[in-house]
Amino acid sequence: MTLLEKQYVLGGLGTAGLVTIYLPLCDGVGHQVSFGLAEELLRLSISMGAEDEYPANWLDSTDPAGRTEKDHRFRVRYNPWLFAILAEQELVKAGVKILYGCYAVDAEVREDRIHSVIVESISGRQRICTRTVVDATGDACIAHLAGAPTETSQQGNILAAWYYSQGSEGYRLNMLGFSDVPAEEDAGRTARPLLDRRFGGLGCGEVSEMMQYSHASTLNDIRKKRRSDPSWVPTAIATMPQLRMTRRIQGEYTLDEGEMHKYFADSVGMVSDWRKRGPIYEVPFSTLYSAKVKNLIMAGRCTSVTDAMWDIMRVIPCCAVTGQAAGTAAALTEDFSAMDIRQLQQTLKNSGVILHERELNIGKL
């Protein structure tokens, strides 16, 4: 297995992008819904210590009385660099070949299959022959290059400029601009956007402008903070654009926000709504692929969902759920349109994944 990583650390927006909140594995009313790799990665992210948020009611206790709708959800804050290195070590142990600074620029498609992916790196341009391809680019780049049907974000992305700092208040994460804050914590916030403009995120010139605006916003905030605290210094800024939604595949099924608590026979796991308490969604396997490119499967924030559902599915737990399903499927078949769904589901269950809400024995909420 070969992993192409455009950056020089693993983790994408969750590490290089400094969006270091591992959003909830639970539904917010006492029930864990995401398991398997989603939980493994959460625990790995804080295995050398959590930052700011630590859900003791989930990690240090099994008492359901401490997991009500009034209690802390199963989410954490982690150190991005520790998480990236720990993840790298896990991949190395698993025998994965990691190619840093390497990204796809084209795909050779023959008879509805990706025969090879053309990549560029410090080594120049190379061809990697493929049996199966998992597109976890976040921008559906492989799908786009291979000619699979895709959709782009209609609402665009608000400017963000998250950065870490050290000052008289200590070490902290400053969440400037777009923020992954649940509705219950967002009440009363009146801060204006950093810029009255949205970004699609799929053009080099536009993304470069976005990064410059982000850098300027960071510098302006530092100057403002230094008026009252001369010791205030930045300790880390994002080294990639803090884009949330850009492009996604049009799969065999498109999941919508209104399909909470709905049973799907081909479910490969469950996710919650990080923004509010209550909803549970089963994730259909048919949202991960298009039959037009039979050996391509999606993982992360570019699966087949409506615009309304996209904001739910773009976060780390959902990326882990779809990533585990996609990777497992890629090990079992070379044609995702002909996937033996029972074999896939059993393999996922053997790895600790719970597939259906009814298996939680909680009924409808």
Language-model-derived ranges and their functions:
Residues 4-56:
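N-terminal FAD cofactor-binding segment of flavoenzymes
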Residues 45, 49-50, 58-70:
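N-terminal capping segment at the start of a domain
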Residues 14, 37, 41, 56-59, ...:
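Flavin (FAD/FMN)-binding glycine-rich loop and adjacent Rossmann-like elements that form
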Residues 1:
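Short beta-strand element of Class I
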Residues 90-97:
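A structural motif corresponding to the C-terminal end of an alpha-helix
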Residues 27, 31, 73-80:
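Short gly/ser-rich anion-binding loops that grip negatively charged ligand groups
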